[in-house]
Amino acid sequence: MTTATSPTTAPAASFALALPAGWARLPARAEHERELTREVDRIVREALPDDLPRDSAEPLRRQLRRRLTDAVEEAGRAGANAVYLPASMDGFALPVSLSEAEVDDESETEPVRIVADLLTEAGQLDGLRDVDGAAAARTSATIASDQAEGSWERTWSKRVVYTVSVPHRPGRWVVLTWSAVYGDEPSERLADALVELFDAVMTTFRWTDVPGADPTPVELAVAAAEEAR
């Protein structure tokens, strides 16, 4: 379970999302630099434990720390509030990431109209979704890149975006972007499965800051987890 509160101009939207065990939320805003450093250090320790030979492991730690920090800071400059990454298992991490952002719409257009416009522009009229009572657009695209990654000479990214209106914060939208990278036929099948995983994760999305509403079981669980930290 992970929770998120946007550091954009208040009032912000808070929500809970159930991600697979081991995923880390890395804050991408400059004001949360210390928290980012703490999370990156934790990920590096788990990926490259202290019992590894220092001479060979330390350069890898520095490289991983730099790559993670640079990627998250770049996402922050692009407007993201946070980036979510899967845990590494036996030295392997799934080639997937999730970014979280919030945007404001100063027009008085109804959310359903905005969702319809987004889906029409994308040519994906079947992407209308209800996310915990909020109108949302699900859009997808495959992005090609000439940049090599590992053994792949060229890569593609299956990108799925949920643009969700915040029903209790007029004009506020939560944007969640899932990106699964692949470079050959077997990894493309994995990317397809990861897209299905994201759609399943989005069924767990719950608002946690609805004014006047009694605390939900999700909110109570989140509060208990925060107190236990």
Residue ranges and their predicted role:
Residues 28, 101-102, 206-210:
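Short beta-strand-to-coil "C-cap" segments at the C-terminal boundary of structured domains/repeats
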Residues 2-17, 111-113, 190-195:
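Short aromatic-glycine motifs in intrinsically disordered, low-complexity regions
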Residues 69-166, 216-217, 225-227:
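Signature of long, low-cysteine stretches enriched in small and polar/charged residues
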Residues 168-175:
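Short hydrophobic/glycine-rich mini-motifs in sensory/regulatory modules
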Residues 28-41, 212-219:
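Short acidic, Gly/Pro-enriched loop/turn segments at secondary-structure junctions
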Residues 13-31:
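Proline-anchored loop/turn motifs at beta-strand termini and strand-loop-strand connectors
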Residues 37-71:
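Mixed-charge, low-complexity intrinsically disordered segments
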Residues 23, 123, 178-229:
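Surface-exposed amphipathic alpha-helical segments
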